[in-house]
């Protein structure tokens, strides 16, 4: 698993000790340090999701796009991701149907039928989305 995270750093020409330190820090950050030597194929779905996030975060991107980042995560790890996202300095774009996850965001946008249907504070947009979905037949 350590190699998978390190692969993200291949284009940065970092000294080996710095590359390893960054990889270990990313694994620790996402609660994966104890699994560093395991093959990703042996991980649970939630652990694979955390590994994917670690592989992105290790490069310290200026923009992070996360598509359903809480999928397959238990509540403990979902909260870990929420805390990690809250402390980011980077711009963060999250695509999710996990409405509770969005409650502390600065801004939420609801897309419906390929257009922006609502844009604003989380509580307002979440209420809008729930009302919109309640009006739709199953």
Q: Can you annotate each of these PLM segments?
A:
Residues 2-10, 20, 24:
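Short helical segment in ABC ATPase nucleotide-binding domains corresponding to the A-loop/adjacent helical element
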Residues 17-35:
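Conserved ABC ATPase "signature" region
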Residues 39-43, 47:
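Conserved ABC ATPase signature
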Residues 53:
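Hydrophobic anchor residue at the start of the ABC signature
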Residues 60:
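Conserved catalytic motifs of ABC-family nucleotide-binding domains
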Residues 64-67:
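Catalytic Walker B motif of ABC-type/P-loop ATPase nucleotide-binding domains
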Residues 115-137:
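Conserved beta-strand-loop-alpha-helix hinge in the C-terminal portion
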């Amino acid at each position: 698993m350590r190699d998978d995270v390190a692969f993200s750093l291949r284009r940065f020409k970092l000294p080996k000790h710095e590359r390893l330190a960054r990889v270990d820090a990313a694994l620790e950050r996402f609660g994966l340090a104890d699994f560093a030597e395991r093959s990703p194929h042996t991980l649970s779905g939630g652990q694979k999701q955390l590994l994917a996030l670690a592989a992105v975060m290790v490069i310290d991107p200026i923009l992070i796009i996360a598509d359903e980042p809480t999928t397959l995560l238990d509540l403990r790890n979902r909260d870990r991701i929420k805390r990690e996202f809250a402390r980011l300095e980077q711009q963060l774009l999250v695509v999710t149907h996990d409405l509770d996850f969005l409650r502390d965001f600065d801004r939420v946008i609801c897309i419906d039928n390929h257009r922006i249907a609502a844009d604003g504070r989380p509580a307002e947009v979440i209420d809008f989305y729930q009302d919109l979905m309640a009006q739709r037949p199953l």
